[in-house]
C-alpha cells in the first residue's frame, strides 16, 4: 500500500508455468484456434489446478456472460473475487486503481460480478458492488458508472438515480431515456419530453426499439459507442422489463418520436 492506494503483488513462484498456459489459452481463443466450448473447458481445468488465480475466474465469468449464462458467470466471478478479497487487509479503505496491471484481474472479477447481478436483476447487489468498484477505481476504466443510474432506478432510489443519470447522460445515450422515464414516472411530462428528445438525437435505435421495431436497420453513418446499435441492443435487452411495466411511458415515447 502506498499513498492510500493498494496494489496486488503476485510472486512469480505463485502460478509458475500456469501463467504461460493461461496466456496461450487466451491467445488461442482470440485467434479462433479453439472454440468457445474448448476455451471454457481449458479455463475450468486451469481454475481447478490453481483456485487462487483470479484472472482465470474472471475470464470464465465473461465467457459465461457471452453465453447468456449469468448464474454460471456469477459463480465464477465470485470465486475470483473471494481469492482477491483474501489478499486485502480487513483494515484497507483505499483505492485499487486500474493503472496498476496487477490490480486488473481483481477489478475484472468485480466488474463481472456486477454484470452477472445486473442480468439476474439483483439490482440492490449490483448497486452495492458498483459503489465498491467506483470507490476502488474512481477513474472507472470499465464503465461501471453507465450501469449505476439504471440499477438505482430499479431499486426505487429515484433521488440518487436522478443525480447519476443527470451527471452522465451527455456521455451515455441510454441515460437520456432513463432520465425521461424517471421524469415521466414523476409526472414531469415536459422534462420527460426534453430528455427523450436528447435520447432521440444521441441514439435513435433505442427509440426504434421502444416503439416496437426490435431490429432497426443500421444507419449509414459512423456512430460513437454511445450512439451505436450495439449499445441500443444491450440497453434494451437488459433494461426493457421496467419499460414493460409502464405502457403509458412507451406510448408517450411513440407519440414524441413518430
Where on the chain are the PLM-derived regions?
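Alpha-helical segment of the N-proximal tetratricopeptide repeat
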Residues: 15-49, 111-119
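TPR-repeat structural position
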Residues: 34-36, 70, 77, 123, ...
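Flexible helix-coil transition and linker loops at the boundaries of alpha-helical arrays
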Residues: 10, 45-49, 81-102, 134-136
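TPR alpha-solenoid repeat register
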Residues: 56, 90, 109, 143-144, ...
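Long, ordered, amphipathic alpha-helical scaffolds
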Residues: 2-4, 181-258
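TPR/TPR-like (Sel1-like) alpha-helical repeat modules
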Residues: 71-86, 131-140, 166-173, 184-208
Amino acid at each position: 500500500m502506498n499513498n492510500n492506494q493498494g496494489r496486488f503483488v503476485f510472486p512469480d513462484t505463485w502460478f509458475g508455468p500456469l501463467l504461460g498456459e493461461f496466456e496461450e489459452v487466451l491467445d488461442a481463443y482470440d485467434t479462433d484456434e479453439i472454440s468457445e466450448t474448448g476455451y471454457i473447458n481449458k479455463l475450468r481445468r486451469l481454475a481447478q489446478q490453481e483456485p487462487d488465480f483470479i484472472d482465470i475466474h474472471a475470464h470464465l465469468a465473461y465467457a459465461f456472460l457471452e453465453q447468456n449464462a449469468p448464474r454460471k458467470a456469477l459463480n465464477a466471478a465470485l470465486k475470483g473475487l473471494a481469492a482477491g478479497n483474501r489478499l486485502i487487509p480487513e483494515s484497507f479503505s483505499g483505492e485499487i486503481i486500474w493503472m496498476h496491471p496487477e490490480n486488473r484481474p481483481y477489478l475484472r472479477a468485480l466488474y463481472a460480478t456486477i454484470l452477472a447481478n445486473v442480468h439476474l436483476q439483483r439490482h440492490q447487489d449490483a448497486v452495492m458492488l458498483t459503489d465498491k468498484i467506483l470507490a476502488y477505481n474512481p477513474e472507472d476504466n470499465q464503465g461501471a458508472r453507465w450501469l449505476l443510474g439504471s440499477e438505482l432506478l430499479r431499486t426505487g432510489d429515484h433521488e440518487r438515480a436522478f443525480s447519476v443519470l443527470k451527471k452522465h447522460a451527455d456521455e451515455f445515450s441510454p441515460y437520456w431515456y432513463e432520465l425521461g422515464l424517471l421524469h415521466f414516472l414523476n409526472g414531469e411530462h415536459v422534462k420527460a419530453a426534453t430528455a427523450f428528445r436528447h435520447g432521440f438525437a444521441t441514439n435513435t435505435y433505442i427509440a426504434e426499439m421502444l416503439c416496437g421495431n426490435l431490429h432497426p436497420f443500421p444507419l449509414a453513418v459512423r456512430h460513437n459507442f454511445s450512439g451505436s446499435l450495439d449499445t441500443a441492443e444491450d440497453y434494451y435487452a437488459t433494461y426493457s422489463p421496467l419499460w414493460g411495466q409502464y405502457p403509458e411511458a412507451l406510448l408517450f415515447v411513440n407519440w414524441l418520436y413518430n
